Amino acid sequence: MTSVTLLHTADMHNRLTAQAAEQLHEIREQNHALLLDSGDAIGALNVTVRRSEPIIELMNISGYTAMAIGNREYFFRKWGMVHKTRAAAFTILSANIQPVRGDMGHIKRWTTVTAPDGSRVGLFGLTPTMIAPGSWVERLSDMRFLPWKQAAQQAVTALRGQVDWVIALSHLGQQRDQRLLELFPQIDVILGGHSHPQITKIEELSGTLTSYPRPYAKEAVLITLGKQQDAIHYDSRVIELL
């Protein structure tokens, strides 16, 4: 049997307080959890780049493991997108954004980590398509969006054989996430964002657990998962943030 504990936030939009950052740090340590975010953490719009993003420093204090690129973290030029999260001491993920040439700096498509309990965890990010293929804006960009289904397939193929858990940090929204879990049952957990639910939603669909916290750093979701052979069981609770 293998198990892992996750602490999940999404769509914080620069609303994380110093108190809440310390609270997340304490919860993460007490529960030996991986702290993960599904994107739109920062305050900048997708068309703007600010000198700094204060929430990134607070997330460093909390001890995040990884976050997905959301539409707020996106910028149509690579330098801007890299700049927005440059201060992160944790991994930034998007499997479906690729550079026209070169690499993406500190931004990765997927990664593997060892959880505090020793289980191996594969993480990948998915970002909503911000520039339509073939559009005039695409000609100005030095990055391209892969179809999210193709990117997810590549990530699952790369990760599944080498980890105990495959976790998608998705900023696609609930409707596309539903399709994601139908297409890729190899994904154990979808930690979602972008949908801004009025009530935090945690449910198991077709054997895949999905989590959607309330936005604006109001709540986080603590999930403990266990796997024995092919059977997965979980326990979850919603935590109100200070």
Region locations from a protein language model:
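Acidic, metal/ion-coordinating pockets
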Residues: M1-L242
